């Protein structure tokens, strides 16, 4: 970025100001996707850092199978932007989250993750309330003690 452009950005927006060079972003997305393609693996980027439907759509256009969200609210924003292949990576607990999941599941088919029976029960209720099955990915602990289900 040139000094003149930096000065113009500071003058226009002040500081601090996040500036994203979309040419660099596009290059990085293409590079990450090419690595996945060469390895023969599906790319499902986690959007918890950028939280941007625009960037998520760029990732999908480059070849990502879908996206992964950390929270239900992130998934809702992505679904409202037209993204239809969404995994929610964390367990959703509580009646309020269950109701929100059912509401979103009526709009777009979701995949959720679970590592405990409480989450599975909540997902079953949400699927019944939505009148649509919910795909559940079971997270198993493979020795790193990051999950409640041990194999």
Predicted regions and their residues:
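Active-site-proximal beta-alpha core segment in soluble small-molecule metabolic enzymes
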Residues: 46-149
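Expand to "…catalyze enediolate/carbanion chemistry for C-C bond making/breaking, isomerization
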Residues: 16-17, 22, 26, 33, ...
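Adenylate-forming
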Residues: 25, 150-151
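Short, basic, glycine/proline-bearing loop/turn elements
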Residues: 15, 41, 61
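Generic N-terminal amphipathic, Lys/Arg-enriched alpha-helix
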Residues: 2-20
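Short hydrophobic/aromatic segments of transmembrane alpha-helices and their interfaces
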Residues: 8-9, 35, 103
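N-terminal glycine-rich anion-binding loops that anchor highly charged ligand groups
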Residues: 2-4, 24-55
């Amino acid at each position: 970025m040139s000094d003149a452009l930096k000065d113009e950005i500071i003058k226009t927006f002040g500081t601090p100001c996040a500036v994203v060079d979309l040419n660099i972003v596009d290059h990085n997305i293409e590079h990450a996707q090419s690595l996945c393609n060469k390895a023969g693996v599906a790319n499902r980027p986690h959007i918890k850092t950028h939280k941007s439907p625009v960037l998520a759509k760029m990732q999908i256009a480059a070849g990502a199978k879908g996206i992964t969200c950390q929270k239900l609210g992130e998934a809702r924003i992505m679904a409202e932007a037209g993204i239809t292949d969404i995994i929610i990576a964390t367990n959703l607990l509580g009646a309020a989250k269950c109701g929100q999941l059912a509401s979103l599941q009526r709009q777009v088919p979701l995949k959720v993750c679970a590592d405990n029976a409480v989450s599975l029960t909540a997902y079953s209720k949400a699927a019944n309330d939505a009148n649509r099955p919910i795909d559940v990915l079971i997270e198993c602990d493979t020795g790193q003690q990051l999950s409640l289900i041990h194999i």
